[in-house]
Every structure is written in C-alpha cells, then in structure tokens.
Amino acid sequence: MAKADFYETLGVAKSADEKELKSAFRKLAMKYHPDKNPDDKDAERKFKEINEAYEMLKDPQKRAAYDRYGHAAFEHGGMGGGGGGFAGGGFSDIFEDIFGEMMGGGRARQRSSGGRERGADLRYNMEITLEEAFSGKTAQIRVPTSITCDVCSGSGAKPGTQPKNCGTCQGSGRVRAAQGFFSIERTCPTCHGRGQIIPDPCPKCHGQGRVTEERSLSVNIPAGIEDGTRIRLQGEGEAGARGGPAGDLYIFLSVKPHEFYQRDGADLYCAVPISMTTAALGGTFDVATLDGTKSRVTVPEGTQAGKQFRLKSKGMPVLRSAQTGDLYIQIQIETPQKLTKRQRELLQEFEQISSKENNPESTGFFARMKEFFEG
C-alpha cells in the first residue's frame, strides 16, 4: 500500500514553516498518543505515521530530499548514512522536548516510584446568599470522594503481603519498542505504568489503595467574598492511589441574586420607587441594610428620577480588609395609575397653573428640539 504524503499526514501545506509543523505535530500526537488510546491499533498506526512525517519534515536536509524525490529518497538506502534514527534517547526524548511543559517532564498522571499516584482534584459548587457573603459563614458540606483504604493503609496489597516490581518493565512503568526509524516509549501494558504489580490485592479496595466514601468537611467562607470565587482546600480531594498524595478540593462559590440589592464589587445598589408627590414635595423613607440596621433617606423637594443617594459604609465588606463599600439608593419616580375623577381634575388643574419654572428640563428640551429642526 502506498505511503501517505507526509504533509497530508500532518495536515499542513508544503510551504509550512517549522513553527506550523511543530504545532500540527503537537496536536495530532496528543490526540493519537498510545497512553490516551490503549489497545487501539488504528490510533497506534496513526501515531507512528505522524511521528515519521514530523521527523522527516523537521530536518531541512531530509525535507529537501523528500520534496524532490518523495518517499523514494528513503528507500533502499537512498539517504546514505543520513537516514539513521535519533542520536541518543530515541523518539521519547523528542516527544518530551516538545510536550515537556504540558507533561511535567514527560511523565503523565504524576506517578512516582512504587506505582503511587496523586489523587484527582475535586470540584464542589456552592451557592450562598448575599447576606451570607456579607457576614461570612462556616458551612458544612458532604463530599463523595475516595479515601485511603483502612485495611491495607493505601498499599493496595492484602495485609501481610507486599506489591512486587513488574517483570515486564523492571519497575520503571515504561517500555520501549523499536518502530523503524523510531524508538517509542509507552506505558507498560502489564502494570499500566505503575512499575509494580499486586499478586494478592486487598479484599476491601481490590488493589486500588482507596475506597469511595462520603466525607463531611467544614468550609470557612470569609466576609466580603465575591461571586465566582474559588476556595482551595489542600489535600481534601481524592485520596492518592497506593499511598500517593491526595488531591485538592476546590469550592466554586456563586452568590444568589438578591431581591433588592445589586452588587458591584464592594458597593451595593438599590432602586427605590417613590411617589410623584414625594419627589415633588420631598419626604423621607427608611432602607433596611445588610448589617441588620435601617438607614433614613431624606428626599429633597424637586428630586428627579435617577437621582442617587450615597449611604457611606453600608455596602459589602472588602475581603481581608477593614474597608467597607457604600450603598447607593437610586430613585425611581412612580407615575400614578387608575386615577379617580377627582384626582384627574386636580392634576389637570395643576397642569393649568404650572409654569416653565416648574418643569425646566422638559420645557427646555422641546424648545431646543424645535429650534434644531425648524431653525
């Protein structure tokens, strides 16, 4: 069967530069890597093709020969002494060089000697009220997670027995296989990368070193915490496998929308509707605040819609600070509805005796508009 074109294999144009080649290879190699596709022959074949294509095209001399002669340049010794493999370390060194930053030095899943694995990080979503965010609280949560097995103390082995080094990989958790030009390192199929096998598994955890259980945890929520804040509880995630360290638990907080207040950082906003007569004649009203007290707001006569009154230090506490935000009262003027005959007569009479001085904004606006359009 004819070999696929190297450029098509990587999904790049023949004019692709080194950066484009590397980016295409990285995406495809991550997608078809044997560790992510165990026992998948098609993925393994695709992975080998990707490796071969990238190795040839990243080398300027090999790429020039391929561009001129195609695959024939590498058949029957066509490359002379230049078509060998990799100098020192084989393909895994190249793979680790490219993916090192993402793979933590080329070893995924944070395994250590003896097959110990760090437990997974867990996420817990918690919703609190604005009042709770204002005052802070200590919450009790129940989290289903994996904990260290109390029978084998996390080793995974039956009490009185010990895990043994894997005979296939000699305890390394990795095996190498020669594939033409390449030496590919992959997870040991016998121990699945742990480096050890457990001949006599623990009867409770079946060799995993951990069991699933629901735990109760206390979470401290500080005053002033904001919507979307993440709280990290170190070591409270999933237990590590076979004695490995535990992961972390992340609490993602959301604050419920409040019936009266909207929050912007440490400041609070409250829209308060008042009657037309209160706006015109002035008056007072009380506002309940989150600290449990009431604040009196004085409305001067002639107050317009949209007017804001600031209540200093009546907002939210600033997280880990002695400062406090402000509460802003935003005035909305309610227009009377369902008027009685007498009310209508009084308003009509008021309209008749009103002057420009009573409504300077509307009078001035319409005068300016008329002048603008009529000249």
From Swiss-Prot:
This is Chaperone protein DnaJ. Pfam families: DnaJ (PF00226), DnaJ_C (PF01556), DnaJ_CXXCXGXG (PF00684). The gene is dnaJ. HAMAP family: DnaJ (MF_01152). Zn(2+) 2 binds at C166, C169, C188, C191. Zn(2+) 1 binds at C149, C152, C202, C205. Belongs to the DnaJ family. Its cofactor is Zn(2+). It is found in: Cytoplasm. Residues 5-70 form the J domain. A zinc finger (CR-type) spans 136-214. The keyword Repeat applies. Keywords: Chaperone, Cytoplasm, DNA replication, Metal-binding, Repeat, Stress response, Zinc, Zinc-finger. Its main location: cytoplasm.
